[in-house]
Regions:
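Ligand-binding pockets and gating/stacking loops
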Residues: 1-462
């Protein structure tokens, strides 16, 4: 019987499904095993004391308007309808239609759009001076996730998993829930890092969050013993190819990563199905996130899944909420987005705190850029990469504080600007990772998430 025939026979079992589903992207010629983070079961690297053990990234695809959410601009409101500054003829200033007020003991300013999230004001650290390099969605979104707008690079979650390893051998360490399909898998991919560090996708932007799941996690046709034997057959052929080649076989690291991915997929059967079952949560917890509420349910499910995976040991969990690209219909569209975000995000922070997880979980909220103060259409805003807002909570950041400032219209950062490389450096710092020392050798040089840039923003750290 030929190997090809045996492989086809094994394809009916979970082992081959795991190999295809979780390791299909294992490409390139990565550094051989033995580099930092190669085994997800190893102890985490710590370059210094960590204040966070995991990250939950609330990713707002489209570019949320900072002037209408967290960065009030009274002058912009007063000058509504006047000619816009510095972007050529035909634009007019657009004042925010939403009222702002201060919240919590810190007096943090927030829009009326967030009645629930404003209750967490004293836990939020607002960075009002973010900037990035390109005002186009695909490039800016990729830079947000990988640090580079031009080249294929490992994603932020992959770097975190590479540095820390997994805290639970039965789970993927990097989860991306409902990522936007149109912007590509590179935003949760591992690029030249071993495929073991790529993100595991749950659902996609094309399907509702209530239907999101992992394909082939369980295989009801076969017993666990049968699945184990079939996977062993596939793995034996993989190892024969890996071990039988003279010297270091090109792509050998990819084969090793595929072997480990297959083993992980097999182990996932014991834990992942229960984690995906939100019916195991109490009615009170589900209500806290807004599950079952019209216009809220989808993102609420994502946030609750994020908490469950964080609690179970995942290192980096990204949840996605798109639709923030409001070139027109600003007021109605922003109300819809804010409603979807408000209760789930507030519930996530409150739930993490109640379970003792917030102190060592960094929650990051933000999009690929912000919005301009002016537009050619009076009911929208255009892309703005020169100044916008992100916020963080937990994980050792200073709650109830703001950092940086944009000008009186919110057009650009004018005080303590924070580049995306600085944000990445700061995030890694909270995890105990030095962004200058977390490197991977590929193509003849050492690569890092921040390339040759990045400064830790120590002012936001507690």
């Amino acid at each position: 019987t030929s190997r090809r025939h045996l492989l086809r026979s094994a394809a009916a079992g979970f082992g081959w499904l795991a190999f295809r589903g979780l390791a299909a992207d294992a490409g390139g010629a990565p550094t051989p095993a033995g580099t930092p983070g190669e085994s997800t079961g190893r102890p985490a690297i710590r370059h210094h004391r960590a204040t966070a053990r995991r990250v939950i990234f609330l990713c707002m695809q489209g570019g949320p308007s900072h002037q209408d959410t967290f960065d009030p601009k009274p002058r912009l409101r007063r000058d509504h309808g006047k000619p816009g500054p510095g972007r050529g003829r035909g634009t007019q200033l657009v004042g925010s239609p939403f009222a702002f007020r201060q919240h919590g003991q810190s007096g943090l300013w927030m829009s009326e759009l967030f009645p629930h999230l404003s209750g967490q004001a004293d836990r939020l650290c607002m960075v009002h001076s973010m900037r990035t390099d390109i005002p186009n969605h695909p490039q800016a979104f990729t830079q947000l996730h990988t640090g580079s707008a031009r080249f294929v690079r490992p994603s932020l979650g992959s770097w975190v998993l590479y540095g820390l390893g997994s805290a639970n051998e039965n789970l993927p360490g990097f989860i991306s829930i409902s990522p936007p399909a149109q912007l590509g898998a590179a935003n949760y991919g591992s690029a030249f890092l071993p495929a073991l560090y790529q993100g595991t996708r749950i659902g996609s932007g094309r399907e509702g969050s209530s239907e999101a799941g992992m394909s082939h996690v369980t295989q009801g046709q076969f017993t666990t013993g049968q699945q184990r034997r079939q996977l062993d057959l596939v793995q034996a052929m993989n190892r024969e190819r890996l071990d039988g080649a003279p010297g270091a076989e090109p792509g050998g690291g990819a084969i090793e990563a595929a072997i480990q991915a297959g083993e992980l997929a097999f182990r996932m059967q014991s834990e992942v199905p229960d984690l995906l079952d939100l019916g195991r949560e109490s009615a009170a917890t589900r209500a806290l996130y807004g599950i079952g509420e019209t216009g809220v349910d989808g993102f609420a499910r994502q946030c609750l899944l994020a908490r469950r995976f964080a609690e179970a040991g995942a290192r980096f969990i990204e949840v996605n909420l798109g639709g923030w690209d409001q070139h027109q219909n600003l007021e109605a569209a922003l109300r819809k987005n804010a409603r979807a975000l408000d209760r789930p995000a507030a519930g996530l922070i409150a739930d993490l705190d109640a379970r003792g997880l917030l102190d060592d979980t960094l929650v990051l909220w933000g999009g690929e850029f912000g919005r301009t103060p002016d537009s050619r259409q009076q009911d929208g805003r255009d892309h703005n990469h020169r100044g916008f807002t992100v916020w963080m909570a937990g994980g050792g950041v200073r709650g109830g504080t703001t950092h940086g400032r944009t000008d009186e219209y919110g057009a650009q950062a004018i005080e303590d600007p924070v580049h995306i490389h600085d944000l990445h450096a700061t995030l890694l710092h909270t995890l105990g990772l030095d962004h200058e020392r977390l490197t991977y050798r590929y193509g003849g040089r050492d690569h890092r998430l921040t390339d040759v840039h990045g400064t830790v923003v120590r002012a936001v750290l507690g």
